[in-house]
Amino acid sequence: MSRRTCSDLRRPSSCPCRLGARTTVDGCKEESPVLSVTMKCFNCNPDLSELEVVKPEDSGIEASYSPVCLEPSCNDCVRNHERLSFIDSPIVGHDNKENQRVQNTLDSSNETEELEASRLYEDSGYSSFTQSDRDDGILILENFRNSPQARLLPSQSPDQHPNKTLLPVLHFERVVCSTLKKNGKRNPKVDREMLKEVIASGNFRLQNIIGKKMGLEHLDILAELSRRGFVHLLANILTKLSGMDLVNLSKVSRIWKKILENNKGAFQLYSKTMQRVIESSKLSLHATTRGYVVGRAALTCVQKSSTWAPPKKDVQIKSSSQRGQRVSTYSRHNEFVEVAKTLKNNESLKACVRCNFPAKYDHYLERAVCKRESCQFEYCTKCLCAYHNNKDCLNGKILKASCKVGPLPGTKKSKKNLQRL
């Protein structure tokens, strides 16, 4: 086995190792009575067979492991050197089980370290993209620091100006959280007035955020477009509408009418149709109920059947009498309901003989009293005359009862009837 030092091997120009430099691993010199190894960088791509083992001249003097690499990029050299020297050393025997366990743990630790190191240097595409963004950002920062605008910005707070890289909502959240964090050290309570001042002073561009009106059943689209200043969209919508549609649009709300007035072309068409409708409404007698609506083709059959015609006198009298009867029946019904709420157990309701309004009827006394304030007639239910207590009816005409009342229970007649049965 030829003895050659690491300096005798051919090295590429990119090798970071320094020739002839010999240091100990981890900056400390440890001496061993076994052997000494002179190591070269494995990343230089020579054959591994050129690694030589140098026996010490004096066996009593401890040798040192001296890898030649000094750069931090040659950590692989040091790890491989330690592993090879540990395997080749005579201390680690094949028959020694304890040493084999130590060797297995070293192998597993080296494999995990190699995997972690390889993951660090992997390029998935995102790292190169972020690296280019960082380089661009560094160049922009250098140019910005040299510019005169960089002197003005330190006086201004960064929270007042919107961050263009963030969404408006995220920028708003960041500003609010930063203000709460600053003031939370002084006062644990939330100062709402201070938050309102911060929100009013900052330009957060929250007015154009999409999705604020999601979930609502009713939404005024034209009002939202006018509030956000989309005049071109409103003009495009109004050009698609006809004259009568514009007339109906102006009746919806004041906001829609203002939108119509702001558009010149649509407002001219609206004014022309309004003049035409007013002229036609003067000629028609039915303009009071129909309004400005002109006859449409879709409802012509319905409009023909519902056209207005002057009613005859007889028909008008009958309709007025029927309406009066409906009103009277409705009012009488309400009166009966109100009086029925005040009835006792032995009382019932009857219509008054004079005014047909509700009257309280007592079955045992055969008396009825009208509850109308203007009437209050008290009469006998047999002869329908003024009530006469226990006296016989004056006219002698007793009205036949609608239903015959049987004998009272416990009387002789009722007992005889029971005996017959």
Swiss-Prot record:
Keyword check for Kinase: no
Compartments reported by the entry: Nucleus; Cytoplasm; Cytoplasm, Cytoskeleton, Spindle
Annotated region described as Inhibits APC ubiquitin ligase activity, given as residue ranges: 280-421
Residue sites binding Zn(2+) 2 per the record: C380, C383, H388, C393
In-chain residues carrying the UniProt-annotated modification Phosphoserine: S85
Gene Ontology terms, MF aspect: anaphase-promoting complex binding; protein kinase binding; ubiquitin ligase inhibitor activity; zinc ion binding
Region ranges (Sufficient to suppress UBE2S activity): 411-421
Tissue expression from the record: Expressed in oocytes and granulosa cells. Expressed in proliferating cells compartments in hair follicle and skin epidermis, spermatogonia, and intestinal crypts.
Spans annotated as Competitively blocks access of APC substrates to the D-box coreceptor formed by FZR1 and ANAPC10: 296-299
Modification after translation, per record: Phosphorylation by CDK2 and subsequently by PLK1 triggers degradation during early mitosis through ubiquitin-mediated proteolysis by the SCF ubiquitin ligase complex containing the F-box protein BTRC. This degradation is necessary for the activation of APC in late mitosis and subsequent mitotic progression. Phosphorylated by RPS6KA2; increases and stabilizes interaction with CDC20.
Residue numbers spanned by region Interaction with EVI5: 114-219
Location (main, coarse): nucleus
Metabolic or biological pathway, per its Swiss-Prot or TrEMBL entry: Protein modification; protein ubiquitination
SUPFAM superfamilies: F-box domain
Gene Ontology CC annotation, any one: cytoplasm
Zinc finger (ZBR-type) in chain: 348-396
Task performed by this protein: Regulator of APC activity during mitotic and meiotic cell cycle. During mitotic cell cycle plays a role as both substrate and inhibitor of APC-FZR1 complex. During G1 phase, plays a role as substrate of APC-FZR1 complex E3 ligase. Then switches as an inhibitor of APC-FZR1 complex during S and G2 leading to cell-cycle commitment.
Subunit structure: Part of a SCF (SKP1-cullin-F-box) protein ligase complex. Interacts with BTRC; mediates proteolysis by the SCF ubiquitin ligase complex leading to activation of APC in late mitosis and subsequent mitotic progression. Interacts with FZR1/CDH1 and the N-terminal substrate-binding domain of CDC20; prevents APC activation. Also interacts with EVI5 which blocks its phosphorylation by PLK1 and prevents its subsequent binding to BTRC and degradation.
Protein name as annotated: F-box only protein 5
Gene source species: Mus musculus
